C-alpha cells in the first residue's frame, strides 16, 4: 500500500524527487530489533537519523566524495537495511562516513571492505522489497561523524530519549545538499492547521476547541 502511494505521488509530480525524513518520528518500525525494555516499559527506536530518497528499484547510487569502503553487507533481518554500504571520507582534514541502505544484495556485496572509490563512482543500485528489508524501494542516506564500535551495521533510527546524542553523531544530510525543501522542522500556525483540516477532514471529525489542538499522529484510539 505504501509503495502504491509513493508511485501515485511520483506520477502526480514526475519531475520531482520524493525525499525527506531527518529526525522524523515514525511509528513504522515494528520489528522486535527496534524495541528494548526501559525503566518505564518498552521503548522503541522511532526517530529517523537519515534522509530517504524514494526511487524505483535498480536506480543507481553514486558516491558524493572520494571514499574507502568500510562496510559492504547484506543485512538480512526483517525491516533492516538489506544491502548496506558504508563509506569513509576525508575532506579538508575532516573524517566522516556516509551510509547507503536498502541497496540490492548483488550490488552491495560486489564491493569489498578496503575498496577505494572516486567521486561519482557507482556504489550500487536500489533493491526491491524482497532484498531491501521488506520496504518500498528507496535509499536511506545518513552521515556519521564516527562509526563508534560498529563494523557491519549502524543505527538508522534512535530512541527519542537519546535524540540529542544521536543528533551530534549523525548530522543533517542536508548540510551537503543545502536544499530548503529538505528542511524537516515545520511548526504550522493555527490558521494553517484550520485551513488544512478544513480541506482534508470531514465535518464529523471536527473537535470543539476555540483553538485547534496540534495533533501530530494517532495511536489506536488516541490522538497525540
For every predicted segment, state its role.
Residues 48, 89, 102, 138-140:
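Histidine-centered active-site/metal-ligand motif
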Residues 63-107:
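Zn2+-dependent peptidoglycan hydrolase active-site motif and core
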Residues 70-84, 121-138:
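Flexible, gly/ser-rich surface segments that form the specificity/activation loops bordering the active-site cleft
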Residues 55, 71, 102-105, 128, ...:
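A residue-level detector for short acidic-glycine micro-motifs
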Residues 1-82, 119, 169-180:
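Surface-exposed, glycine-biased beta-strand/turn segments
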Residues 85, 141, 221-223:
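Generic short beta-strand
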Residues 181-224:
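N-terminal glycine-rich, Lys/His-bearing helix-loop that initiates the first secondary-structure elements
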Residues 109-121, 128-131, 137-181:
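Acidic, glycine-rich catalytic/binding loops that coordinate metals and/or anionic ligands
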Amino acid at each position: 500500500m505504501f509503495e502504491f502511494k509513493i508511485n501515485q505521488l511520483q506520477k502526480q509530480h514526475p519531475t520531482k524527487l520524493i525525499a525527506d525524513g531527518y529526525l522524523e518520528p515514525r511509528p513504522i518500525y515494528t520489528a522486535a530489533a527496534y524495541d528494548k525494555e526501559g525503566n518505564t516499559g518498552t521503548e522503541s527506536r522511532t526517530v529517523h537519523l537519515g534522509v530517504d530518497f524514494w526511487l524505483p528499484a535498480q536506480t543507481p547510487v553514486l558516491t558524493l566524495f572520494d571514499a574507502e569502503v568500510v562496510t559492504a553487507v547484506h543485512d538480512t533481518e526483517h525491516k533492516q537495511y538489506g544491502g548496506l554500504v558504508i563509506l569513509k571520507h576525508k575532506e579538508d582534514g575532516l573524517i566522516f562516513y556516509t551510509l547507503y541502505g536498502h541497496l540490492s544484495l548483488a550490488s552491495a556485496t560486489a564491493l569489498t571492505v578496503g575498496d577505494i572509490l572516486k567521486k561519482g563512482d557507482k556504489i550500487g543500485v536500489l533493491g526491491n522489497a524482497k532484498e531491501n528489508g521488506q520496504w518500498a524501494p528507496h535509499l536511506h542516506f545518513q552521515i556519521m561523524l564516527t562509526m563508534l564500535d560498529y563494523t557491519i551495521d549502524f543505527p538508522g533510527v534512535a530512541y527519542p530519549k537519546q535524540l540529542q546524542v544521536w543528533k551530534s553523531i549523525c548530522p543533517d544530510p542536508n548540510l551537503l545538499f543545502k536544499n530548503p525543501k529538505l528542511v524537516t522542522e515545520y511548526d504550522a500556525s493555527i490558521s494553517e492547521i484550520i485551513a488544512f483540516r478544513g480541506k482534508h477532514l470531514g465535518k464529523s471529525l471536527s473537535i470543539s476547541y476555540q483553538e485547534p489542538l496540534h495533533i501530530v499522529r494517532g495511536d489506536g484510539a488516541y490522538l497525540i
